[in-house]
Every structure is written in C-alpha cells, then in structure tokens.
Amino acid sequence: MDLQAQLEELRKSTQATLKEMSGNHSKELQDLRVKVLGKKGSLTELLKGLKDLPNELRPVVGKQVNEVRDVLTKAFEEQAKIVEAAKIQAQLESETLDVTLPGRQIHLGNRHVLSQISEEIEDIFLGMGFQVVDGYEVEQDYYNFERMNLPKDHPARDMQDTFYISEDILLRTHTSPVQARTLDKHDFSKGPLKMISPGRVFRRDTDDATHSHQFHQIEGLVVGKNISMGDLKGTLEMISKKMFGEDRKIRLRPSYFPFTEPSVEVDVSCFKCGGKGCNVCKKTGWIEILGAGMVHPSVLEMSGVNSEEYSGFAFGLGQERMAMLRYGINDIRGFYQGDSRFTEQFN
C-alpha cells in the first residue's frame, strides 16, 4: 500500500474509532490521540516515508499529510467536548439538589450602634455645610498638645493619662490634631472653615462601667470672620434637637479648656422627665452632653491665622456618651464585647 493510501486509511480508521467512543471514554480518547498524533504516533511514522518518494510527489503527499492532521485534530477536539459534556452531566446527576427542601435562614450581622450614631451625627453636620476630615490615630506630641495650647508642664501630658509610644509620638487623646492640620492648610479667601473630625481616641483609663481606654469622639471647628458665641449656641441647639428631640433646650455653664476661651460645658434638658427631675438627670432636669468654647487666639495664631481678624468656635462630643444617653445604656463596655444580644437591640 502506498503512502497516500496509508494516510487515507489512518484518517478513516481513526474517525471510525472516535465515532464509536462514548462520552465516558476520557482515558481512551487521550490514549488514541497520543497513538495517532503523538511524537511517536502513526502519523509521524508515515511522515518518515516522505524522504523515499520521488521529488514530484513530495509536495502532493506533504499537503495530504497536513490535511489529514487538521481533520483528525478537529475530530479529537470535537470528541473531547463530548467527553467533557458527559462528565458535567454525570456530575449534575450525582449532585442533584432537592429544591423542595426548606431553605435555611442566614443569620445577618447588625450595624453597630456606634456606627449608627456616628453616621447620624455626620449627616447632621454635612447638612449644615460642614466637611468631615479624618486624621492619624498615632500622632505627634506637637499636634496633640502644643498646638492645642497645652504646654509641656500641663497635667494632661502626665504619663498616667496618655499612651506614649516615644518621647514625641503618642496615641492621640482627642481628634483636635486633625483640626490643627486642617486649619494650617485652609484657604480663607474661599470662605470660612467648617469641619468635624470623628475618630477613635485613647486615654490611660481603667476600664469600668463609665470609662474605657479607647472611645470615639467627634470634634467640630468653625473659623471665619465675625464668628460669635451666638453662632456656637445656635449650632449646639441644632445638634441637641436633632439627636434628642425638637423640644430640647440647652444651657451653657462656664468651664475651662486650654484651647478655648471662653469655655463652656453644654447641658441638654432631660429627655426622660422633660426637666422636672428624675434618676437620669439626677434630679437636676439637665444632662451634660459635651464641651465647647470660642477658639483660643493662641491656637489660631499657631496656624498663621490673624486672631484680630478671624474668630471661631470648637466643640467635642463622645459617640458612646450620646448612645448611652439616648438608649439608657449603663455600661460602656457593652459597646466593645461583641455580644450580638447587645448589638441587635439597636437595629
């Protein structure tokens, strides 16, 4: 049998074998492919006979070889698809799902009450034209204390109150450093600065029902021309009404903070008794909610802001305290213990 006849016979016999194969013959298919098209396969052996052909027949037979290779390659690919489809079908049949079985309820997590409070407060201030600015939790001593008018010998620098990492690096005790950095960069030719800076802060406190070594604060700052105590009071009245009810009133009591002058403690009329006196307000009719004041001129000057031309106010409130007051929570540790029975109450 001449070479051309052998090529035709190889094509026909291989196609016939492939046609007889079922989808379950994956290994047999691979073995046949190697036997026919492999480096030592039948087609390769026939190719060796080209050198013995007359010169005029070599191109003709060579073309036939390529045609047979292409036809068989395509045939093997088609059969491989059949085998793969059969494999998938068998897998589906063996893993059939019973769609009549009742579904299993997926337990969803709860948004933490502190996240809810924080977002609510941020939304209130965003609606008043404030910007929200984040900052570093690991802070320089300079920004945490000196820029807030807290000199080296101030009691707040005591090692018992602050987590120092090194002599000049610490875990921030408030979010005020964010305000200082933002004040440094603000362009007052474009208008006043109105910002809040939410985030975690750290103190060397012993954890108990009312204290935690870490907690959350939102501090606010407004600086511009002709900013007055009346602007501060109006802002505080707005936040108290939004958080505790439209019929709430506030009062300002003189206080002291190094970075504000004058400084005030802010009380809100008790939302449980309406100011008549109860166990929540300790019979006073008022509940302390935050501290505030007019920005100290020294704080402005350290940012290169002319305190003769510009003034401002600042305030700081704690999300934990806001949540405890609103929901009657009596132990701050509940916020951090990860107990779903606690967090799911505030959905």
Swiss-Prot record:
Localization (cell)? Cytoplasm
- Domain of life (superkingdom): Bacteria
Known CDD domains for this protein? PheRS_alpha_core
Q: What class of enzyme is it?
A: ligase
UniProt-listed InterPro entries:
aa-tRNA-synth_II (IPR006195), aa-tRNA-synth_II/BPL/LPL (IPR045864), Phe-tRNA-synth_IIc_asu (IPR004529), Phe-tRNA_ligase_II_N (IPR004188), Phe_tRNA_ligase_alpha1_bac (IPR022911), Phenylalanyl-tRNA_Synthase (IPR002319), tRNA-bd_arm (IPR010978)
Instruction: Look up the record and name the cofactor or cofactors this protein needs.
Output: Mg(2+)
The cofactor remark states:
Binds 2 magnesium ions per tetramer.
Q: Which GO terms describe its cellular component?
A: cytoplasm
Q: Which cysteines are joined by disulfide bonds?
A: none
- Molecular function (GO) terms listed? ATP binding; catalytic activity, acting on a protein; magnesium ion binding; phenylalanine-tRNA ligase activity; transferase activity; tRNA binding
Q: What is its main location?
A: cytoplasm
Q: Keyword check for Metal-binding, yes or no.
A: yes
UniProt keyword terms in alphabetical order: Aminoacyl-tRNA synthetase, ATP-binding, Cytoplasm, Ligase, Magnesium, Metal-binding, Nucleotide-binding, Protein biosynthesis
| A single BP term in Gene Ontology | phenylalanyl-tRNA aminoacylation
Provide the catalytic activity annotation. Answer: tRNA(Phe) + L-phenylalanine + ATP = L-phenylalanyl-tRNA(Phe) + AMP + diphosphate + H(+)
Give the EC number: 6.1.1.20
Q: Which PROSITE patterns match?
A: AA_TRNA_LIGASE_II (PS50862)
A Pfam family recorded for this sequence: tRNA-synt_2d
Which residues of the sequence carry a binding annotation for Mg(2+)? 261
Entry similarity comment: Belongs to the class-II aminoacyl-tRNA synthetase family. Phe-tRNA synthetase alpha subunit type 1 subfamily.
In terms of NCBIfam families, this protein maps to: pheS (TIGR00468)
Q: Which proteins does it associate with, and in what oligomeric form?
A: Tetramer of two alpha and two beta subunits.
User: This protein is called what?
Assistant: Phenylalanine--tRNA ligase alpha subunit
Q: Which organism is it from?
A: Streptococcus mutans serotype c (strain ATCC 700610 / UA159)
